[in-house]
Amino acid sequence: MRKLSPYGRKLLQRQQTQDRQQAERDFFAAVQRDVRGLQIDAGLHCWTGNNAGTMVNTCGRLLYIVAFAANAAGVSPDHPDMRIMRGMSEALGDLADDLDAIERHRASIQSGLGAIDRLLPLCTLVALLEGSYELEQRLNSVRGMGTQDVRELIGVAA
């Protein structure tokens, strides 16, 4: 291996720094793209879909991630959009229990998606990433995830 001159080491360090920064930008862009894709899927299923199971899955995933990120951003549990998300959580829980009641809960879920749209600018990418990681951990656990988990994130005791 050839020994580098001080100038060569400096160029190598600069290139490694640029590569690391580009990798971080690409990673955060992928997180943004995934959250945006989940948001679009949830909106499509909520507004036009008739598959209640898919609606519960996509909307519930988005709800958990944004509730986690909003909680990390310090949004008050009494914030109107957090209350709307709490109602969305209850509607998704009821819909999961009775998949035939899709029209009864559609308006609450649509309102919750609007609240999510308003809360997303307050959330950091790191918090969204942590929320998606926490969601996957909960879904892969034995206990799973339910309405109570979202209520705890929003700041409401059982």
Named regions from a protein language model:
Residues 23-30, 34, 58, 87, ...:
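Charge-rich, solvent-exposed alpha-helical interaction surfaces
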Residues 1-4:
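BZIP DNA-binding basic region
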Residues 67-120, 127:
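Long, low-complexity or tandemly repetitive, helically biased scaffold regions used
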Residues 19, 26, 34, 41, ...:
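Acidic-enriched, low-complexity/disordered segments with a strong bias for Aspartate over Glutamate
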Residues 10-73, 154:
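Short terminal alpha-helical segments
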Residues 100-158:
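Amphipathic alpha-helical binding modules
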